């Protein structure tokens, strides 16, 4: 429509800022049978001194109970008799009608009010309200009217079964897992390294080994719900007491591929180096196989006991992310939180035949003693030289996911035009330059693919962009050449 005036238009074709995704989120699966449960919302009315105190409680735990309300009103007496006591629940509000005598004076006891409320039948799918007298009270006191009041104090279950829950580096949160099962000890190993963000999936405990394995597998499947329920995507996947099992290991590997994550797998207690190496040959470029088991002093009993290494390794990875960057290898960095190793692999600097080096060459990581216990090994379970380093894999994951997220949020479904292509390329290239300046990568660039971006493909709504990145590999081997130079520092023997 034509306008006699000034029309305002906004140009949104400028390049968009790309932010690097969070690579330091751990996904943890395990058991915690004594984990804290949710709390039901409550409301207390009346007085214990008057023997008319009543406690109203939501029929289910959770914050939804905080939306419930209660009120008590005096009934209206007719000419012949007083009002009867009754209760009605509608739209989250409980209305109690207090019985009266013929003159309209409330004469119903607190005990009778409790009986009237509890006589209500609630739909099992809906939240209702129960009433009770405090312990030791008879409830003979006369109930008093009160205006609409809300129940309070309802809290959701902090760790519902098979549901991702976030522990944001807090030991107080971790204690809500309870001390039995596996998850508390796993969290302790992680938090001994750093205050990490951990997506925890609690599963049922079962004495039957196969049933327990099935529970763990179901918990691993639940990790993929992290982005949609918590807005966090797990990038380091562990199931410490269970990942010695290849069924669990393969499930973690599969989930790692879906989440663009790395799975850390533990080795069985007292496994030989040869057994560990043979097992590693079953896995690929999303798995790091850990040879050692560590001896940790319990913060509950003070006793030393053997533990899988994967939880400590995951916390160690996050600590290196925080102090140096996610593009750094965690190898040759001191690991915290344990006193000794279950088995010691021979290690000597420069010795190709020591067990630690042989494990590394077979794509297995271990721990060595070198001014503290150091993680020793850069590689994932693949022989592909381009993808065998964990640091390279995680760098590419970070860049790929960051660009993908930005393209999805800012450009997907926008009309295809020259300005769209220019803006997308400018955004990606600007981001890659930032990564170069920050020391994350050596180089990178993006360009439109002229061969694939045909008239037909563009008409079909498909745009092709090529991105080339040069990540930084860790200096896994440093070769130093020495020679004796006889022409310098000559010593004169003349008198």
PLM feature spans:
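Surface-exposed assembly/interface segments
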Residues: 1-495
């Amino acid at each position: 429509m034509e306008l006699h005036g000034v029309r305002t238009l906004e140009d949104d074709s400028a390049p968009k800022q790309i932010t690097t995704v969070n690579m330091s989120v751990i996904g943890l699966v395990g058991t915690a049978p004594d984990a804290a449960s949710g709390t039901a919302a409550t409301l207390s009315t009346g007085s214990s001194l008057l023997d008319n105190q009543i406690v109203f409680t939501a029929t289910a735990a959770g914050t939804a109970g905080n939306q419930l309300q209660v009120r008590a009103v005096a009934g209206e007496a007719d000419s012949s008799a007083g009002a009867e006591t009754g209760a009605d629940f509608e739209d989250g509000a409980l209305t109690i009608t207090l019985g009266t005598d013929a003159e309209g004076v409330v004469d119903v006891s607190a005990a009778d009010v409790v009986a009237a409320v509890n006589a209500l039948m609630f739909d099992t799918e809906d939240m209702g309200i129960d009433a009770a007298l405090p312990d030791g009270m008879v409830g003979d006191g006369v109930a008093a009217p009160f205006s609409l009041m809300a129940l309070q104090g309802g809290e959701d279950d902090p760790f519902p079964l098979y549901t991702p829950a976030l522990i944001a580096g807090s030991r107080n949160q971790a204690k809500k897992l309870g001390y039995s099962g596996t998850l508390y000890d796993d969290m302790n190993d992680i938090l001994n390294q750093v205050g990490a963000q951990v997506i925890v999936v609690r599963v049922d405990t079962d004495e039957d080994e196969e049933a327990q394995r099935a529970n763990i597998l179901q918990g691993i499947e639940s990790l993929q719900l992290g982005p949609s329920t918590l807005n966090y995507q797990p990038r380091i996947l562990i199931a410490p007491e269970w990942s010695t099992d290849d069924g669990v290991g393969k499930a973690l590997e599969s989930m790692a591929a879906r989440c663009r994550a790395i799975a850390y797998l533990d080795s069985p207690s007292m496994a030989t180096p040869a057994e560990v190496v043979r097992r590693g040959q079953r896995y690929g470029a999303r798995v790091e196989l850990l040879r050692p088991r560590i001896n940790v002093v319990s913060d509950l009993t003070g006793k030393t006991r053997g533990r899988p290494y994967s939880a400590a390794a995951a916390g160690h990875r996050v600590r290196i992310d925080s102090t140096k960057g996610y593009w750094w290898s965690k190898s040759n960095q001191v690991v915290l939180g344990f006193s000794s190793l279950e088995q010691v692999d021979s290690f000597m600097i420069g010795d190709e035949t020591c067990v630690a080096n042989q494990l590394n060459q077979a794509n297995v990581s271990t721990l060595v003693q070198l001014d503290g216990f150091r993680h020793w090994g850069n590689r994932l379970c693949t022989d592909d030289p381009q993808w065998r380093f964990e640091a390279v894999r995680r760098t590419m994951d970070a860049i790929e996911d960051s660009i993908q997220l930005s393209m999805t949020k800012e450009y997907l479904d926008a009309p295809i035009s020259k300005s769209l292509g220019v803006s997308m390329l400018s955004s990606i290239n600007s981001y890659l330059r930032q990564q170069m300046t920050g020391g994350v990568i050596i180089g990178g660039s993006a360009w439109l693919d002229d061969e694939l971006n045909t008239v037909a493909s563009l008409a079909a709504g498909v745009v092709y962009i090529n991105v080339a990145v040069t990540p930084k590999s860790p200096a896994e081997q440093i070769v130093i050449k020495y020679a004796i130079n006889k022409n310098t520092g000559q010593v004169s023997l003349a008198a």
